[in-house]
Amino acid sequence: MFDLIIRGGAVYDGTGRPARWADVAVSGGKIAAVEPLPQAQAARVIDARGKWVTPGFIDIHRHADAAVFRPGFGELELRQGLTTIVSGNCGLSCAPVGPENLPAILSYLEPICGRVPPEAAQETLAGYFAAQPAAPLHTGMLVGAGTVRASAAGYQVQRLEPAHYAAIHRRLEQALADGALGVSLGLGYAPECFYTTHELIRALAPLAGQSIPITVHMRQEGGGVVTAAQEMVEVARALKAPVHISHLKAMGRDNWRGKVPQVLALLDRARQEGLDLSCDVYPYTAGSTQLLHILPPEFLAGGMEAIVRRLGDPDQRRQLARRIESGDGFDDIARLAGWDGIFLTSLHCPEDHPYQGMSLARIAALTGQDPLTCCCDLLVRERGEITMIDFMADEEDIAAILRDPFSNLISDSTYPTEGQPHPRVYGTFVHLLTRFVLQRGDLTPELSLIHISEPTRHLRIS
């Protein structure tokens, strides 16, 4: 007598082997048998005829650092088949954070992680794990190197002093000892966008030769994506450490169907050299992050208060307009996606709520402003805490990445406290199976399930 039998489904084991028709018996919360069990009985029987039975889905790239503290967390994730998630991505973990720059860090995190409760903003990851409520699925954390740098040195552009590096090293080592699964970088975000490659390698010195996974939101994902990937090869070579590129894409129509194949070929050559490089991708042509991400690096210096002051200055706005017009040296999302391709999904001020879900082009037309002025006014009024969805990627590039054997699927889900989230929060895995398996045929069912049930190989967890 079993507790549960899932009867008659097509059972995929997630290794790439073809499905087999079988029953799955469960006792005591563990799988007891996978075979035809026509005579077996159970307290509960699920009829899976005509359905797939798969391992639990794993998402190694979410931003649920603060969301795990919300009541009812986990239902949304379980209902889409997730049994394991990893947060702390893109350098933006909500711990460890010291008291020195705490308000600035939490303000910067809010559009992506949502409002961070005091019990989550711990000085150590051990404290974070101890405070975290029980969840109905497995949760893991990366330590965000951006948060670590901001804790040690704030959001300033200036060159770091030896004492800053020492503080960064201590925090990284402590977080890894506390149970971090690896280190995440956010080179497209402040303050890590201020690193040179040499400085970045110096900051990550404790990882040298340690086989500790490094995941990275690269410095650029548009016209400069190949150069950014070359930088990651250099980091992997210098540190002799595994590097995993997060949400690989080529933003902007001019970069589609050319840059991604170049990056994949670059990574393949690096692996032939003996380096450990991999990547992941989400299955949507639209991304989602903080609206501040449209700004060039120099406009992100000093933290949120400085950013807001800068955007309120007419001279600074004129300089910003020139920078966006030229697009040099940063991911110019205003040009890559277009003002009509940037939609605002999380706004806090009551007067701005009617604009939620609208494009910046549409809001500008309604307010009688040019899009950049409209954008700056909103960022000032909302104190920078706006989440956007931006349409900038290509489905053929996504398919090419999915076909690469060293890639896996992620959602890159953000969890703003209010607003309209990107559908990837709840639809990523269904979208992969329906769009790229059943409709387009880019992947077989067997290969698709490797992408979503075995991505932990890139983080060395099982």
Predicted features and spans:
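Histidine-rich, glycine-flanked metal-binding segment
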Residues: M1-G56
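Metal-associated gating/positioning segment near the N- to mid-region
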Residues: A40, A48-E119
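Histidine-centered divalent metal-coordination motifs
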Residues: H61-D65, H217, H451
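Active-site neighborhoods of metal-dependent hydrolases
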Residues: Y128-P162, I168-Y189, R237, A241-P242, ...
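Divalent metal-binding pocket/active-site signature
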Residues: Q174-E234
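C-terminal amphipathic alpha-helical interaction region
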Residues: L443-L447
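Single conserved hydrophobic/aromatic residue that forms the stacking wall/gate
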Residues: I450-S462
